[in-house]
């Protein structure tokens, strides 16, 4: 776990800030993304940068659309999705108006300083020549491989890359995507803060399934799309505790089912789903407390672990997001599943308070009454107390 923490804090990693889409007043920028093949990737980048994603158009939200969408350009209310990619690539918040889609703009390249004359149709991709890869595209490729490659042979075959090309993840051909990954990206996941090599399913269940169905293992379909049928939304709410908090022990037991560990940007603690680890005990403390913990801590049943897995999968399926994004949302909402569901759906917590960010957690550690009072004013006394308990678990 210490190794994962070091990777998450790699100063040389070309990743964007966790407050990239946070305003100066501390509030998160809200985005609405029109349905498209790139919506999932954009949502992941936005949430990682501290922003929120709305399921419907809301007042004050930045409306995003792909260049070339006639309705979006005709309205003049939409910003090009290239805005998100450029902000991530430069790791800075750029001018929104320079990316506004409209009849007078060149939709294919809405960057600052671009010519506004000519057709509104997107510029066709050139048939010859090379298009340079951006850091955002490299992250997108690694993320796609991590989520969709089911075996080491998947990345050397062609099906995965053809599926990636059809998803319009980038403007590159599947041959170029495959070449980029095999020659430049494979084994470099740690530099992009994506953890270890993606193609290593830890679940024996997934391994057996891949052996039984080799074609499915190379199909390029997202893993979360192959999950068993899930109950309706009403059942999801039934799985949530009355106080809205996740059972951390359940999620710790459930984590291996997904084969992923998620490292948060917040200081001093790491999570597996919503499991937080505090400071490691000294050998003396460990030897003294371990027997008591084994006696007092109730064993989690298989049924309870299954319920936790089901709830997380339902959030992933419901909002079409990956495990990392759902986990980050849970962390920013102190492990409250009901609040997390509301946050992913509307970009807001049901109690109206903001989500927690790295700076808030740093302030929470300060022994300063003024700082603590400011946090209580910002989040409410109950949420501050809940956050403190959440970090201790």
UniProtKB/Swiss-Prot annotation:
The primary location reported for this protein is nucleus
- Please list the GO terms describing molecular function: G-rich strand telomeric DNA binding; phosphatase binding; telomeric DNA binding
Q: Does the keyword Transcription regulation apply?
A: yes
Family annotation (Pfam families): BRCT_2, Myb_Rap1, Rap1_C
Where in this protein does the record say N-acetylalanine is found? 2
GO process terms (BP)? intracellular signal transduction; negative regulation of DNA recombination at telomere; negative regulation of telomere maintenance; positive regulation of canonical NF-kappaB signal transduction; positive regulation of NF-kappaB transcription factor activity; positive regulation of non-canonical NF-kappaB signal transduction; positive regulation of telomere maintenance; protein localization to chromosome, telomeric region
Q: Which residues form the Myb-like domain?
A: 125-185
- List residues, modification Phosphoserine: 36, 43, 151, 153, 200, 203
Q: Which key words tag this protein in UniProt?
A: Acetylation, Activator, Chromosome, Cytoplasm, Isopeptide bond, Nucleus, Phosphoprotein, Telomere, Transcription, Transcription regulation, Ubl conjugation
Domain BRCT: start-end pairs: 78-101
In this chain, the stretch annotated as Disordered covers: 104-132, 193-304
Source domain of life is: Eukaryota
Q: Where is the composition biased (Acidic residues)?
A: 282-297
Give residues for the crosslink Glycyl lysine isopeptide (Lys-Gly) (interchain with G-Cter in SUMO2): 111, 191, 205, 209, 237, 366
Keyword flag Cell inner membrane: no
How is loss of this gene reflected in the phenotype of the organism? Mice are viable and fertile. No major telomere dysfunction such as telomere fusions are observed. An increased telomere fragility and recombination due to defects in HDR are however present. Mice with conditional deletion in stratified epithelia display shorter telomeres and developed skin hyperpigmentation in adulthood.
- One GO term of the cellular component aspect? shelterin complex
SUPFAM superfamilies, alphabetized: Homeodomain-like (SSF46689)
Q: Where is this motif: Nuclear localization signal?
A: 377-393
User: Subcellular location, in the record's words?
Assistant: Nucleus; Cytoplasm; Chromosome; Chromosome, Telomere
User: What is said about its interaction partners and assembly?
Assistant: Homodimer. Component of the shelterin complex (telosome) composed of TERF1, TERF2, TINF2, TERF2IP ACD and POT1. Binds to TERF2 (but not TERF1) with its C-terminus. Interacts with SLX4/BTBD12. Interacts with TERF2; the interaction is direct. Does not interact with TERF1. Associates with the I-kappa-B-kinase (IKK) core complex, composed of CHUK, IKBKB and IKBKG.
User: Anything else the record notes?
Assistant: Shares a bidirectional promoter with KARS1. This shared promoter with an essential gene complicated the task when generating knockout mice; the problem was overcome by generating conditional knockout strategies.
Q: Which family does it belong to?
A: Belongs to the RAP1 family.
Q: Which PANTHER family match?
A: TELOMERE REPEAT-BINDING FACTOR 2-INTERACTING PROTEIN 1, TELOMERIC REPEAT-BINDING FACTOR 2-INTERACTING PROTEIN 1
Function, in words: Acts both as a regulator of telomere function and as a transcription regulator. Involved in the regulation of telomere length and protection as a component of the shelterin complex (telosome). In contrast to other components of the shelterin complex, it is dispensible for telomere capping and does not participate in the protection of telomeres against non-homologous end-joining (NHEJ)-mediated repair. Instead, it is required to negatively regulate telomere recombination and is essential for repressing homology-directed repair (HDR), which can affect telomere length.
Descriptive protein name: Telomeric repeat-binding factor 2-interacting protein 1
What organism does the record attribute this protein to?
Mus musculus
């Amino acid at each position: 776990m210490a190794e994962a923490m070091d990777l998450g804090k790699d100063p040389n990693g070309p990743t964007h800030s966790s407050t990239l889409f946070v305003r100066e007043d501390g509030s998160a920028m809200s985005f609405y993304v029109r349905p498209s093949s790139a919506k999932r990737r954009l949502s992941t980048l936005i949430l990682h940068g501290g922003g929120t994603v709305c399921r419907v158009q809301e007042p004050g939200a930045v409306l995003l659309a792909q260049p070339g969408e006639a309705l979006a350009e005709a309205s003049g209310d939409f910003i090009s999705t290239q805005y998100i990619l450029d902000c991530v690539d430069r790791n800075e918040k750029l001018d929104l108006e320079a990316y506004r889609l409209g009849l007078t703009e060149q939709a294919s390249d809405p960057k600052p300083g671009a010519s506004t004359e000519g057709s509104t149709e997107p510029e066709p991709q050139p048939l010859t020549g090379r298009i340079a890869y951006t850091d955002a595209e490299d992250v997108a490729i690694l993320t796609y491989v991590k989520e969709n490659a089911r075996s080491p042979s998947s990345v050397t075959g062609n099906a995965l890359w053809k599926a990636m090309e059809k998803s319009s993840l980038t403007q590159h051909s599947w041959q170029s995507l495959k070449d980029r990954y095999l020659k430049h990206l494979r084994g470099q996941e740690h530099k992009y803060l994506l953890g270890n090599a993606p193609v290593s399913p830890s679940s024996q269940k997934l391994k057996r399934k891949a052996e039984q169905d080799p074609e499915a293992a190379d199909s390029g379909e997202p893993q979360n799309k192959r999950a068993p049928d899930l109950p309706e939304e009403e059942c999801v709410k039934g799985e949530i505790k009355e106080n809205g908090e996740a059972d951390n022990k359940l999620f710790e037991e459930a984590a291996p089912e997904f084969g992923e560990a998620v490292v948060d940007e917040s200081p001093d603690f790491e999570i597996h789903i919503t499991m937080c680890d505090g400071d490691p005990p000294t050998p003396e403390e460990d030897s003294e407390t371990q027997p008591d913990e084994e006696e007092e801590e109730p064993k989690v049943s298989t049924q309870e672990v299954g319920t936790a897995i089901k709830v997380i999968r339902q959030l992933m399926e419901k909002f079409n997001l990956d495990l990392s994004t759902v986990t980050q949302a849970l962390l920013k909402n102190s492990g409250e599943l009901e609040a997390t569901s509301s946050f992913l759906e509307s970009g807001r917590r049901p109690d109206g308070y903001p989500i927690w960010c790295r700076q808030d957690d740093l302030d929470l550690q300060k022994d300063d009454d003024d700082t603590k009072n400011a946090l209580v004013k910002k989040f409410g006394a109950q949420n501050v107390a809940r956050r403190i308990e959440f970090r201790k678990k």
